Amino acid sequence: MPASITGLLRPDIAALEPYTPIVPLETLAERLGLPVERIIKLDANENPYGPSPHALAALAAVERDAPHRYAIYPDPDHVRLRAALSRYIGQPPERIICGAGSDELIDLLMRATLRPGDTMIDCPPTFAMYSFDAALYGARVVPVPRTDQFDVDIEGVAEAVEREGAKLLFLAAPNNPTGTPLARSDVERLLDLPIILAIDEAYAEFAGTSVVDMVGACPNLVVLRTFSKWAGLAGLRIGYAAMHEDVAAYVWKIKQPYNVNVAAEVAAIASLDDLEERMATVARIVAERERLAAALAALPGFRVYPSAANFLLCRITGGAARARTICDGLAQRGILIRYFNRPGLDDCIRISVGRPEQNDALLHALRELV
């Protein structure tokens, strides 16, 4: 046995700052001394209404009528799911790749694109997984900060691409954690740059806008989507990406063959078959977003940023200490929201939009705290 096992591991990983995920619900409930059913979870942008009834019925049908499906490997080509997605987004199946959540697709695209020493542009504040994955592959991450209103600095990005020779740019649209939309005209300008532009549309259904129709004509455009938010399937880890078929051929080569499990595929297809119910749920969340935004803006010391997603970012007068105090105070009452201990957001909290009664409980608690 070697004297030091760490000597056989990648030394750069030792210095890598790990990504901080949401603490599991059961762990938080135990830590707070509360039963799980007492917790109001507004910290991870999940769908408060859960999966489609059609999806739940489809899963129950597999368990009842075809349990053997769980004992055999899933379809490595996701033929039925890609056909359903083709009808949903209007792109042919050969432009669609499925994965275990959009997180896997972010990783796959970086694996297909970035070599050690290559450069990726990041536009903070944004989803931290972009810079984390890029660092994992030994890429240089060049930040181009967003404006005070969290818009993308298009000219700054163009200058950075030319100056740094960057290959890849990830942009969430709407952005997480700010909820800021991305104009189609800005996407068109960015597509003129000599980079691969990955648009992460995890919250597109809540925004009502998309650029997925552009992938056929734009070989350097990749659009990522997920079933975690609008479809309420975060626990099953299912997402997909649409891209030009030339790029898809590269990504397909490095995709693990059985990366989407049977349950996830069954639930995703059933959700796509139940679009009327799912879109009605999305509409309810959007309506609640606007009601909640107005109520939060009326609280003393709250600045609420406009959002096109299923969450709201609030800047708190009094700085980081006050924002953290509010977050902790809500947690003691069994209400979980997100505090970001990072530059530019350390005086902010992010609140996922819940059901009306959950939002009312949140507002009642906030009025006590502020």
Curated annotation (Swiss-Prot):
CDD domains for this protein: AAT_like
EC number(s) given by UniProt: 2.6.1.9
Pathway: Amino-acid biosynthesis; L-histidine biosynthesis; L-histidine from 5-phospho-alpha-D-ribose 1-diphosphate: step 7/9
Keywords: Amino-acid biosynthesis, Aminotransferase, Histidine biosynthesis, Pyridoxal phosphate, Transferase
Coiled-coil annotated residue ranges, if any: none
Catalytic activity: L-histidinol phosphate + 2-oxoglutarate = 3-(imidazol-4-yl)-2-oxopropyl phosphate + L-glutamate
Domain of life: Bacteria
Keyword Transferase carried by entry: yes
Single GO BP term: L-histidine biosynthetic process
Modified residues (N6-(pyridoxal phosphate)lysine): K229
Cofactor needs: pyridoxal 5'-phosphate
GO molecular function (one): histidinol-phosphate transaminase activity
Family stated for the protein in its record: Belongs to the class-II pyridoxal-phosphate-dependent aminotransferase family. Histidinol-phosphate aminotransferase subfamily.
Complexes and interactors: Homodimer.
Name of the protein this chain belongs to: Histidinol-phosphate aminotransferase
UniProt organism field: Roseiflexus sp. (strain RS-1)
